[in-house]
Amino acid sequence: MALDFRNPVAIITKNELVTRDIDVLSQLAAFDCAAVYLSITTLDANLARRLEPRASTPENRLHAVRALNEAGVPVGVLAAPIIPGLTDHEIPALLKAAKDAGAQFAGYQVLRLPHGLKDLFREWLETHVPTQAGKVLNRIREVRGGELNDTRFGARMKGEGVYAEQIKQMFTLARKQAGFSAGGPRLSIDHFRDPTDRQATLF
């Protein structure tokens, strides 16, 4: 339906299966109506397997970036979620790998732990990286005003404080060094097809 009406589509995914629709996405991209972000938490395959067991491997996500780029689909990466004290040091390598794979833009988000996720994540840390658990939780509190989560608009995605600023500066420098521009994709509604009979055209 998006293709039929040339409706702009932006996709954020951790799954390489987005390439199954590469033919549709490339047709939409011809009208500036498509963009895809592959979200990558870490390049460490072992860590990724423990963090995101049901998601595509980092290598396969980069393969998806390459395939989408070669098909003419605007594609970028989200370094997300960045886990302070665990994955933030990977930002430069992650952005370089993404650029080498053909990513055209990049962004980031810091880990959020709303509701019951706080307890689940604490349990995960104690199970999988027990020697780093205390450090990671303290770093998260540093960027969340002493708490493990911050729901305030404008703060929840990037965090606040000295450590959040360090992450921001690291990302900004790494993005520049990798060759990314500061902007993201620009989608167009210039080619949107407005049906004369909306109900009839659905069937």
For the regions a language model picked out, list residue spans one by one:
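Auxiliary Fe-S-binding modules of radical SAM enzymes
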Residues: 89-203
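Short, catalytically relevant binding-site loops at active-site mouths
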Residues: 43-44, 82-85, 112-115
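Active-site glycine- and acidic-residue-rich loops that bind
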Residues: 12-19, 83-92
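Core AdoMet radical
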Residues: 1-65, 74-78, 105-107
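Alpha-helix N-cap and loop-to-helix initiation/capping positions
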Residues: 52-60, 86, 128, 162
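Conserved aromatic-histidine-acidic binding/catalytic patches
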Residues: 10, 53, 82-86, 155, ...
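A structural motif corresponding to the C-terminal end of an alpha-helix
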Residues: 1-8, 63-75, 143-146, 170, ...
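Short, conserved, surface-exposed binding loops centered on an aromatic residue
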Residues: 28, 66-70, 96-100
